[in-house]
Amino acid sequence: MLRPRIIPVLLLQENGLVKTIQFGDERYIGDPLNAVRIFNEKEADELAVLDISASKKGKEPNYRLIERLANECRMPLCYGGGIKDLDQANRILSFGVEKIIVSSLAIENPKMISTMASYLGSQSVVVAIDFKKAMLSRRYEVMIHNGTKKTGKHLEDLVKEVIELGAGEIILNSIDRDGTMVGYEIEIIKKIQSICKIPITVLGGAGSLDHIKNLIQELGIIGVAAGSLFVYKGVHKAVLINYPNGTDKEALFP
């Protein structure tokens, strides 16, 4: 079994970092370069940076900022937001970013995912699927453009399609659990595990290291991501970048 990765997720809005609750209610939490330096010191396994302003507004990626983040980062860095074509993806990887993350592309131009996987290698292409519980249904619906647009596509169906397109990894991102810190969507994660033959990273809902421990030990998930857990501390959610030390991290694994 591969060693699980504990992955902080940082949300960019323009040049600053924010944290959201259910993809809204953005709260400014600081400078991205400073956050990267702190995660360097804490020896995070990997770091994911998602530019939600680029995703919402359909803007080009902020290449200057991405390059600065990549130069600062001493851990594997994944970037998502505004990536629509092969040239953009290739440029971002040329900065030293390890993986690019796409989301809306899986709905709006799925063939581009296959093209990226062919030219860049599947290991460099990650598809993030933002999902929420459908009204009056037990199924989960996929949303795009940072949760602002419905697709009518069910989560399980898109997962199968993304695998066939050649993506190397899927991020399951729960809109309902985002920023709530009440725990991950365990039942739907189990269901997706049963149909998914590529690595899964789970995001949305982590409020404690126990939530991460349960995901790793009960489900065998090898990619566990969190936002609020690693930028807030205490019941009043004071902004404080944090990450488990070596001893605490070892306790999460079987």
UniProtKB/Swiss-Prot annotation:
Pathway involvement of the protein, from the record: Amino-acid biosynthesis; L-histidine biosynthesis; L-histidine from 5-phospho-alpha-D-ribose 1-diphosphate: step 5/9
GO molecular function: imidazoleglycerol-phosphate synthase activity; lyase activity
Subcellular location, principal: cytoplasm
Family annotation (CDD domains): HisF (cd04731)
Active-site residues per Swiss-Prot or TrEMBL entry: D130
GO biological process: L-histidine biosynthetic process
Any GO CC annotation of this UniProt entry: cytoplasm
Coiled coil start-end: none
Compartment(s) where it occurs, according to its Swiss-Prot or TrEMBL record: Cytoplasm
Record EC number: 4.3.2.10
Keyword check for Cytoplasm: yes
TM regions (residue ranges): none
Keywords of the record: Amino-acid biosynthesis, Cytoplasm, Histidine biosynthesis, Lyase
Protein task: IGPS catalyzes the conversion of PRFAR and glutamine to IGP, AICAR and glutamate. The HisF subunit catalyzes the cyclization activity that produces IGP and AICAR from PRFAR using the ammonia provided by the HisH subunit.
Complexes and interactors: Heterodimer of HisH and HisF.
Family: Belongs to the HisA/HisF family.
Classification via NCBIfam families: AglZ_HisF2_fam
Protein name according to UniProt: Putative imidazole glycerol phosphate synthase subunit HisF
Native source organism of the sequence: Leptospira borgpetersenii
